[in-house]
Structure formats: structure tokens, C-alpha cells
Amino acid sequence: MVEWTDDERAIINSIFSTLDYEEIGRKSLCRCLIVYPWTQRYFGGFGNLYNAETILCNPLIAAHGTKILHGLDRALKNMDDIKNTYAELSQLHSDKLHVDPDNFRLLADCLTVVIAAKMGTAFTVETQVAWQKFLAVVVSALGRQYH
């Protein structure tokens, strides 16, 4: 079980309180698909992902990015039990969608870049430490059902 300090909880809650889920979700998922093009294979039903411009303008990608951020909101609300909170989602990505679990880390890295850019100087070292810890727990929970 992960131990969270009061400061870590406050930092993570503060980050989420300022997020525009639509903007940050879209930018993060688009960045992941553009920077790591092999991740596009999981989005075959999302239409044309031929180049960066089509990815950035794709409403299905934007909607899924928002959905991902709302999924992270579930982790925020269940910080003391992220593993069980994501058990079903982990199984879905493992058994049905066959997503390589390394892609969760890639998306988490892209999300961090987007949030850091948005927060600017407010994304301090202390903020990053708490944020990275949170995302590491989420990524671990999402990869838990893989064998």
C-alpha cells in the first residue's frame, strides 16, 4: 500500500483542481500518439491518424483524452486504494484491448509534459515529485492484471 503525505495529497488535489479535462486530456493523448506513433495501433477505429494535424483535429481522440482524465479523477478520489479502483480497467486493457502496459507510462509522461507546460513555474520540483508518484501508482495499477 502506498503512503501519501498530507503535502502530496494537497499537491495532487491542487493540480486536479486547475485542470481543464478537455484541453489537457486532448493534448496529452495527441502528444502520445504523435511522439510514439506505434501507440496509434490501439485507435484503429478512431479514423484517420495519418499525421499530426489529423490527430490534433480528431474529435474521437479529443473525447478519449477527456475520458482518460476522468479516469484519473477516479484515482484521485480513491488514492488509498488505486489498485482496486483500477482492477476492472486493468483487466479490460489486458484481456480485451490487448494494450501493451508500457503505453500507460508513455501516456503518463506525455500528461506530465502537458501539465508542466500549462503550470509553468508553479510546476516545482516538489510538485513533480508528488505528481510522478501519483502517476507511478496509477500506471502500476493499470498494469496489474497483465500476465
From Swiss-Prot:
Signal peptide: none annotated. Pfam families: Globin. Residues 3-147 form the Globin domain. Heme b binds at residues 64, 93. One of its GO terms (cellular component) is haptoglobin-hemoglobin complex. One of its GO terms (biological process) is hydrogen peroxide catabolic process. Keywords: Heme, Iron, Metal-binding, Oxygen transport, Transport. One of its GO terms (molecular function) is haptoglobin binding. Red blood cells. It comes from the Eukaryota. Heterotetramer of two alpha chains and two beta chains. Belongs to the globin family. Involved in oxygen transport from gills to the various peripheral tissues. This is Hemoglobin subunit beta. It comes from Merlangius merlangus.
